[in-house]
Amino acid sequence: MIDKYEDPFIRIAVMIGGDEYLKVARSLLKAEDATDEEIASSTGLRINMVRKVLYDLFGKSLISGVRVKDERKGWFVYRWRSRREEVESFIENQKKKIMGRLQQRLDYENSSEFYHCGNDDCQRITFEGALEEMFKCPSCGKVLNLKKNDKAKKAFGKKIDEIKKDLQQTF
């Protein structure tokens, strides 16, 4: 369980992956330059789960790993450390990705006319699809009518504006 006063690194880790990520993130903050075996023993998680979490966080640039030779075993091991300074840029990048996807969807909604039969179980169809089906629903056979998508366009536009405003305030 986390609270709103928890370290942002831990909060982001939980959002990405849940309880396993929470345990690994807390362990990384407690012990700088920890190996995956040390993290596994401190969290009680299996080593393969710890490695999965570490590789995912590493792929998102939220942690860094340094390869060193273990003097006792002679093997190379990774020592992991959190990159707390990267949390803000990670959040900013995620917001930009979401905003881009929303903008693509808004552009699609703006550039297309949609048709629907009125049955909740059936999907709406673009004009081209309706024309191919002779304006008959391919699922139920009812006549397809023009369906307004103003609500969807307004919702996408509003969310895009919220994210833009948030990005301007934060950065």
Curated annotation (Swiss-Prot):
Residues 5-88 form the HTH TFE/IIEalpha-type domain. The winged helix domain is involved in binding to DNA in the preinitiation complex. One of its GO terms (molecular function) is DNA binding. Monomer. Interaction with RNA polymerase subunits RpoF and RpoE is necessary for Tfe stimulatory transcription activity. Able to interact with Tbp and RNA polymerase in the absence of DNA promoter. Interacts both with the preinitiation and elongation complexes. The lineage of its organism: Archaea, Nitrososphaerota, Candidatus Cenarchaeales, Candidatus Cenarchaeaceae, Candidatus Cenarchaeum. This is Transcription factor E. Pfam families: TFIIE_alpha. Keywords: DNA-binding, Transcription, Transcription regulation. Transcription factor that plays a role in the activation of archaeal genes transcribed by RNA polymerase. Facilitates transcription initiation by enhancing TATA-box recognition by TATA-box-binding protein (Tbp), and transcription factor B (Tfb) and RNA polymerase recruitment. Not absolutely required for transcription in vitro, but particularly important in cases where Tbp or Tfb function is not optimal. It dynamically alters the nucleic acid-binding properties of RNA polymerases by stabilizing the initiation complex and destabilizing elongation complexes. Belongs to the TFE family. One of its GO terms (biological process) is regulation of DNA-templated transcription.
